[in-house]
Amino acid sequence: MSVLVYFSSSSENTLRFIERVGLPAVRIPLNERERIQVDEPYILVVPSYGGGGTAGAVPRQVIRFLNDPHNRALIRGVIAAGNRNFGDAFCRAGDLISQKCGVPYLYRFELMGTQQDVENVRKGVNEFWQRQPQNA
């Protein structure tokens, strides 16, 4: 199985969600100067920022990560976290990344997610990778 790549701010809501999912995962560093490069296909898990608009919805660290052509070539799907207080902009980062990278938007959850969200993501990610060609 391939990995989840995720970003979590200093609030660590996304980190706590990823820990509960319990699948292999790599964190995009909070420090914008630190870079990582992945070497296998992955699903990106990303929080949404910005309070409702498109500008700023995707964290800068995630933009930098995806601007690396090697990293961008290996993304296979996106899962987004958000806050329902933002209305129509709930999980906007997932919409934007899905569109720009041409990958499926697999799931969205609020804040740290519920136990049902954790189970849905765990099951959905496993099923997603089983459907992928071996060298996808």
Swiss-Prot record:
<dbReference type="GO" id="GO:0010181">
    <property type="term" value="F:FMN binding"/>
</dbReference>
<dbReference type="InterPro" id="IPR004465">
    <property type="entry name" value="RNR_NrdI"/>
</dbReference>
<dbReference type="Pfam" id="PF07972">
    <property type="entry name" value="Flavodoxin_NdrI"/>
</dbReference>
<dbReference type="GO" id="GO:0036211">
    <property type="term" value="P:protein modification process"/>
</dbReference>
<dbReference type="InterPro" id="IPR029039">
    <property type="entry name" value="Flavoprotein-like_sf"/>
</dbReference>
<protein>
    <recommendedName>
        <fullName>Protein NrdI</fullName>
    </recommendedName>
</protein>
<dbReference type="InterPro" id="IPR020852">
    <property type="entry name" value="RNR_Ib_NrdI_bac"/>
</dbReference>
<comment type="similarity">
    <text>Belongs to the NrdI family.</text>
</comment>
<comment type="function">
    <text>Probably involved in ribonucleotide reductase function.</text>
</comment>
